[in-house]
């Protein structure tokens, strides 16, 4: 029953107090099971049907889908349950204790983005879900901060096709309709070690990598010349060489060299297209030195994302907020949810506070966020 639902600030406090860190390092990684249980119980109290799904390939992580209403279409409100690890010693407050001070709510996940679920629950307190004319779905995902495994799995397996979706990442309540993607690769070259006094008896992996880097930088120039999206502050795909390591001694021919790089593609560029461009760029090295160069993913790739600017969702949200949609350079789960329905990224708090010590959400976002959630539910589920 709704009268069992705690006050807004107590919901927020309980979410922050329930650790759900995701990390590639196993020692830091945590299950989100306790947080999912909290959310599931609250949405059941509001009259929602709740389904909890294990996410394959994760360390005991779960998605939750809460649904009410019948028929096709409707609205999906989505967010992730996990946070990044916190920097021990750099926080001046307990990351897992919600603390209010000087118009700010402090705690790990206040902005990015456990708080969004507190806003949804509080807004639904005054909504009679039995009278919805179209379905309302609430999706809570796992591992957004690492592999985005939760959103990927949901998009791959669900039969739902809502009319539209909103992901409540911290955008300072400025609607976002597009962002770049992210691809990160390891380029590895296997040479042949030997004594440096006789270079002909070995194959120097550093020299081969030098050749490969030249072709990769040509690809970077080609991407900049060929692809443009003027709405972005950096209106072309970027390519960065971020890490390199090779060899072990000055008097030894280098046997192995490894380069880490990333590409941030524009919306509309497919992952297959980018992989093809990279492989084509490195083809001369492979032809000259067959079998010595490999390209491997460092992290699962994220495509670029764009919601059609003329979609009803964009028009409605722009009218409600009195603000035009924007494009951003960071990544979200939107590319995966967008495969199901037109999607906007829109939520309280600033991205500038995400992943920072003493993360906070300004209390000035409380009233307009609650009003916005209520308005979009009324528009897309009652009309």
From Swiss-Prot:
<dbReference type="InterPro" id="IPR002933">
    <property type="entry name" value="Peptidase_M20"/>
</dbReference>
<dbReference type="InterPro" id="IPR036264">
    <property type="entry name" value="Bact_exopeptidase_dim_dom"/>
</dbReference>
<keyword id="KW-0479">Metal-binding</keyword>
<keyword id="KW-0170">Cobalt</keyword>
<keyword id="KW-0378">Hydrolase</keyword>
<dbReference type="GO" id="GO:0008270">
    <property type="term" value="F:zinc ion binding"/>
</dbReference>
<keyword id="KW-0862">Zinc</keyword>
<feature type="binding site">
    <location>
        <position position="145"/>
    </location>
    <ligand>
        <name>Zn(2+) 2</name>
    </ligand>
</feature>
<dbReference type="InterPro" id="IPR010169">
    <property type="entry name" value="AcOrn-deacetyl"/>
</dbReference>
<comment type="similarity">
    <text>Belongs to the peptidase M20A family. ArgE subfamily.</text>
</comment>
<dbReference type="Pfam" id="PF07687">
    <property type="entry name" value="M20_dimer"/>
</dbReference>
<protein>
    <recommendedName>
        <fullName>Acetylornithine deacetylase</fullName>
        <ecNumber>3.5.1.16</ecNumber>
    </recommendedName>
</protein>
<dbReference type="InterPro" id="IPR011650">
    <property type="entry name" value="Peptidase_M20_dimer"/>
</dbReference>
<comment type="pathway">
    <text>Amino-acid biosynthesis; L-arginine biosynthesis; L-ornithine from N(2)-acetyl-L-ornithine (linear): step 1/1.</text>
</comment>
<feature type="binding site">
    <location>
        <position position="112"/>
    </location>
    <ligand>
        <name>Zn(2+) 1</name>
    </ligand>
</feature>
<dbReference type="Pfam" id="PF01546">
    <property type="entry name" value="Peptidase_M20"/>
</dbReference>
<dbReference type="GO" id="GO:0006526">
    <property type="term" value="P:L-arginine biosynthetic process"/>
</dbReference>
<keyword id="KW-0055">Arginine biosynthesis</keyword>
<dbReference type="GO" id="GO:0005737">
    <property type="term" value="C:cytoplasm"/>
</dbReference>
<feature type="binding site">
    <location>
        <position position="80"/>
    </location>
    <ligand>
        <name>Zn(2+) 1</name>
    </ligand>
</feature>
<keyword id="KW-0028">Amino-acid biosynthesis</keyword>
<keyword id="KW-0963">Cytoplasm</keyword>
<comment type="function">
    <text>Catalyzes the hydrolysis of the amide bond of N(2)-acetylated L-amino acids. Cleaves the acetyl group from N-acetyl-L-ornithine to form L-ornithine, an intermediate in L-arginine biosynthesis pathway, and a branchpoint in the synthesis of polyamines.</text>
</comment>
<dbReference type="InterPro" id="IPR001261">
    <property type="entry name" value="ArgE/DapE_CS"/>
</dbReference>
<feature type="binding site">
    <location>
        <position position="169"/>
    </location>
    <ligand>
        <name>Zn(2+) 1</name>
    </ligand>
</feature>
<dbReference type="InterPro" id="IPR050072">
    <property type="entry name" value="Peptidase_M20A"/>
</dbReference>
<feature type="binding site">
    <location>
        <position position="355"/>
    </location>
    <ligand>
        <name>Zn(2+) 2</name>
    </ligand>
</feature>
<feature type="active site">
    <location>
        <position position="144"/>
    </location>
</feature>
<feature type="binding site">
    <location>
        <position position="112"/>
    </location>
    <ligand>
        <name>Zn(2+) 2</name>
    </ligand>
</feature>
<comment type="subunit">
    <text>Homodimer.</text>
</comment>
<dbReference type="GO" id="GO:0008777">
    <property type="term" value="F:acetylornithine deacetylase activity"/>
</dbReference>
<feature type="active site">
    <location>
        <position position="82"/>
    </location>
</feature>
């Amino acid at each position: 029953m709704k009268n069992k639902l705690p006050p807004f600030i107590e919901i927020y406090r309980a979410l922050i107090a329930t650790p759900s860190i995701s990390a590639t390092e196993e020692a830091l990684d945590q299950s989100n099971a306790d947080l999912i249980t909290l959310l599931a119980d609250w949405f059941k109290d509001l009259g929602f049907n709740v389904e909890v799904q294990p996410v394959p390939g994760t360390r005991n992580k779960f998605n939750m889908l809460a649904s009410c209403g019948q028929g096709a279409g409707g609205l999906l409100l989505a967010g992730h349950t996990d946070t990044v690890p916190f920097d021990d010693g750099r926080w001046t407050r307990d990351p897992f204790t919600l603390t209010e001070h000087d118009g700010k709510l402090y705690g790990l996940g206040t902005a990015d983005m456990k708080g969004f679920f507190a806003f949804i629950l509080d807004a639904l307190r005054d909504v009679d879900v039995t009278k919805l004319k179209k379905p309302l779905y609430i999706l809570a995902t796992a591992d957004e901060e690492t592999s985005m495994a939760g959103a990927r799995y949901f998009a791959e397996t669900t039969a739902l096709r809502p009319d539209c979706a909103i992901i409540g990442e911290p955008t300072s309540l400025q609607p976002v309709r597009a962002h770049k993607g992210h691809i990160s690769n390891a380029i590895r070259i296997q040479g042949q070690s030997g004594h440096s006094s006789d270079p002909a008896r070995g194959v120097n992996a550093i020299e081969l990598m030098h050749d490969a880097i030249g072709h990769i930088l040509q690809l970077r120039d080609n991407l900049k010349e060929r692809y443009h999206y003027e709405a972005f502050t950096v209106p072309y795909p970027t390519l960065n060489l971020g890490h390199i390591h090779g060899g072990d001694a000055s008097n030894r021919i280098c046997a192995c060299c490894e380069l880490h790089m990333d590409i941030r593609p524009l919306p509309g560029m497919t992952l297959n297209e980018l992989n093809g461009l990279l492989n084509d760029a490195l083809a001369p090295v492979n032809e000259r030195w067959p079998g010595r160069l490999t390209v491997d993913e460092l992290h699962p790739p994220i495509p670029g994302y764009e919601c059609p600017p003329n979609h009803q969702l964009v028009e409605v949200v722009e009218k409600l907020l009195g603000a035009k949609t924007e494009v951003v350079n960071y990544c979200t789960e939107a590319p995966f949810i967008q495969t199901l329905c037109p999607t906007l990224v829109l939520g309280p708090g600033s991205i500038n506070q995400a992943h920072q010590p003493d993360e906070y959400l300004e209390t000035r976002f409380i009233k307009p966020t609650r009003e916005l959630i209520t308005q979009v539910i009324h528009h897309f589920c009652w009309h």
